[in-house]
Amino acid sequence: MGFRSLSPYVWPIYGPWMASSLGMSILLVALPIVLVGDGHGYTVAALVAGAGGAGAALAALPVGWCTDRWGPARVGAGALLAVIAASILMASMARPVFLGLGHLVFGGGSLGVMLSRQADLTRRIPITLRGRAMSLMGGTMRFSVLMGTAVGGFLVDVAGARWTFLIAGVGAAIGLPAVLPGVRNPDWEIAPVGVKGPRMAWVIRANKRHLLHAGLFGMSSMTTREGRMVLLPLVGVALDLRPATIGVLVASGYAADLILFPVSGAIMDRVGRLAAMVPAYGLLAVGLLCLLVADTATGVLLAGLVMGLGNGLSAGSLFTLSSDLAPEEGTASFLSAVSMVTDVGRVIGPLLVGLVAGRWGLDAAAVTLAVAMMLGLVWLSAVVGETGGRTGDRP
């Protein structure tokens, strides 16, 4: 079995996740540019940018509970509608407090789409194909992020902030037709178990060791990934680059991501999870340290490419790790608990960048993110270990 066997899932599973990622990535580039350009400081820009991660963390447990009971399609449809409403709010009232609130809801909705798709896919795909299935999930996200980051700065330049926020919502809305058949025919789905399914508290207690294993590494890596998304635009602003140029610099790293995601899945399935993850996340840390000597657009581009190589080789790794450790009963609830811990990093990353950069500068922020990633790699290698062969090692 290979990537071709995943073709039936491209539209119903990967399509909605790709659509919501497109909208989210437009916002991640546009928000720091808009806020700093309007005279707000790094801290305000980082707080608003981090609100998306906060929304994802807050939504994680409710989304898992709902998915186990009502099914991935209904949850995915509701999440996409929330994303559309959030974009309308941001376009209507473009003040920092409303941008933060809208981004909070947008982040929660994107998390709902992701978890509902992952829960469905986890139950359908055998472990021997899981690395490639989840790397394709990461790869489709990277393709949408590449598109979003490439046009995010351009849209701010050409259309202005309000239209950019609306377009982010329209991008997410593309995924709605993919989940509607499942809403009309819940019997097509595998994941929903109804009201007799396990309680969230029971799932967490019974799987707390695996929850900490996957969640803490996910939090470390997400801190670095999300911090990078805020740091690179701020470095571009510090170099007096145009918003469109900043968008291209950020997108260049995602081009490398997109090329390498099939390699990530093949290595995870054929060699092992650690063989793909340790070198990949190590490159992400190295790329951040390269920013210390980058004082031109070319230097930032090269650093972004190194980070992109690492991020591409890690495509789908967090999805794979959590799916490897997920129990048969209460799969969506477990995945949502892991996601909640992981998404704390989505809040910490932008906040670290804003607070450290505001006090000690952007170089210090880059070092801080690199250290966070290295600590995560120590945890992964020394504590978590290889998960690809744990089909029978579940509590």
Predicted regions and their residues:
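C-terminal membrane-cytosol helix-exit motif in multi-pass small-molecule transporters
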Residues: V170-A191, G376-V384
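Juxtamembrane intracellular "pre-TM" segments in multi-pass secondary transporters
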Residues: M1-S7, R184-A214
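Helix-loop boundary and gating motifs at the non-cytosolic
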Residues: L6-G53, L211-F217, S221-V235, L239
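Helix-to-loop junctions at the C-terminal end of transmembrane segments
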Residues: A59-G71, L260-G272
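Residue-level signature of mid-helix packing/kink "hotspots" within the transmembrane helices
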Residues: G53-L61, V145-L146, Y254-P262, R346-V347
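Paired small-residue
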Residues: V97-V105, T298-V306
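Cytoplasmic helix-loop-helix junction between adjacent transmembrane helices
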Residues: L104-M141
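Structural signature of the two symmetry-related core transmembrane helices
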Residues: R74-I88, G169, A275-L289
